[in-house]
Swiss-Prot record:
Keywords: Disulfide bond, Ion channel impairing toxin, Knottin, Secreted, Signal, Toxin. InterPro entries: Huwentoxin-1, Huwentoxin_CS1. Belongs to the neurotoxin 10 (Hwtx-1) family. 12 (Hntx-12) subfamily. The presence of a 'disulfide through disulfide knot' structurally defines this protein as a knottin. This is U6-theraphotoxin-Hhn1a 3.
Length: 97
């Protein structure tokens, strides 16, 4: 009698543990998807914030300044490079005169 009760409890515990792992898996997947959407939205907002080039026309100055919109690095001023993802001129980590 005691062994049957222990066996039932053991099966019940196994089911509870399995359900707990399944719930944790669902929460982890949901959290990852939510974080991915937040990152995409944050990148889109950040890109839109700096995409407008409020400075002078690039033809007038010959190059685009820091955070100016660009398509290739040659459009940016010295010590700036066109950022691959956001398409603006960012510092290329060089220092010089």
């Amino acid at each position: 009698m005691l062994i049957k009760q222990f066996s039932r409890r053991s099966k019940n515990t196994k089911v509870q543990i399995l359900l707990a792992f399944a719930a944790l898996f669902v929460l982890a997947v949901g959290s990852y998807a939510s974080e991915s959407k937040k990152l995409d939205l944050r990148d889109a907002l950040f890109s839109a914030m700096f995409s407008a080039d409020y400075q002078l026309n690039p033809q007038e100055r010959g190059c685009r300044y820091f955070l100016g919109e660009c398509k290739k690095t040659s459009e940016c001023c010295e010590h700036l490079a066109c950022h691959d993802k956001h398409k603006w001129c960012a510092w290329d980590w060089t220092i010089g005169k």
